[in-house]
């Protein structure tokens, strides 16, 4: 637990009478890339959203970047501090359509971190260069492709200089030919040592870039371990079936 960026023990989450997470336990270490996979409705996105308190757990223990997220009454200041250190990239990019790309990137650093406009602008431009979109600073989101929007969303998250990045199916809404450009940026971040938790259906990415993988099924962790080993030689019948449907071939 000493090197844990995220530690969770017996985590439960329900929506009304629907139990979504049923006693999930695990740990994500600093510098790791961990993929969370599983069929629709298994709870993977809900678990991810618990990691930056977009959802509050109903039971169990959850420590993220040293903060106890099982506490029911975190202050607004505590939540803002958490979300500054635990960035999130959503399936839908959620860029503000009436603002330029640059303004989308500088808004949170100015409002939350109290950065000066010049400082936030310089940082935003450097991260746009990092994701290969330096020339798009003055563009509006509707002038970008889906892949470009998602890369801007990643740059926006990086502008908060997070310790942890959460990705909720970042490529699932993209045309297949645009997926690669987003995964390339994510791979670069992984190589630089960013702690990343990725809910994904991109099994090749999970196998090649991920250190470990959690396979969720019906609200529980059915299998976990080294990403390449788990995805190449799954132990459970359910995971074998899932992978065969994802890849189109029998495993």
Go through each PLM region and give its residues.
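C-terminal boundary and immediately downstream tail of ABC-type ATPase nucleotide-binding domains
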Residues: 216-218, 224, 228-251
């Amino acid at each position: 637990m000493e090197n844990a960026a995220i530690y969770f023990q017996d985590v439960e989450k329900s929506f009304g009478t629907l139990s979504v997470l049923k006693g999930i336990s695990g740990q994500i270490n600093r510098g790791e890339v961990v993929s969370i996979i599983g069929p629709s409705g298994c709870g993977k996105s809900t678990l991810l959203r618990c990691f930056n308190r977009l959802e509050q757990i109903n039971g169990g223990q959850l420590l993220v970047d040293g903060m106890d997220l099982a506490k029911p009454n975190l202050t607004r200041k505590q939540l803002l501090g958490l979300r500054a250190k635990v960035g999130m990239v959503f399936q839908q990019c959620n860029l503000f359509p009436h603002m330029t790309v640059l303004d989308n990137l500088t808004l949170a650093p100015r409002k939350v971190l109290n950065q000066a406009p010049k400082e936030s602008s310089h940082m935003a431009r450097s991260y746009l260069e990092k994701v290969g979109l330096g020339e798009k600073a003055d563009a509006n989101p509707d002038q970008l492709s889906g892949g470009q929007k998602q890369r801007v969303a990643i740059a926006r998250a990086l502008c908060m200089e997070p310790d942890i990045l959460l990705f909720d199916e970042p490529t699932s809404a993209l045309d297949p030919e645009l997926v690669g450009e987003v995964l390339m940026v994510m791979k670069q971040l992984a190589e630089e040592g960013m702690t990343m938790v990725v809910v994904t259906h991109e099994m090749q990415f999970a196998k090649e870039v991920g250190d470990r993988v959690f396979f969720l099924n019906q609200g529980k962790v059915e299998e976990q371990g080294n990403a390449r080993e788990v995805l190449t030689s799954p132990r459970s019948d359910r995971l074998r079936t899932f992978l065969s449907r994802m890849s189109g071939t029998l495993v």
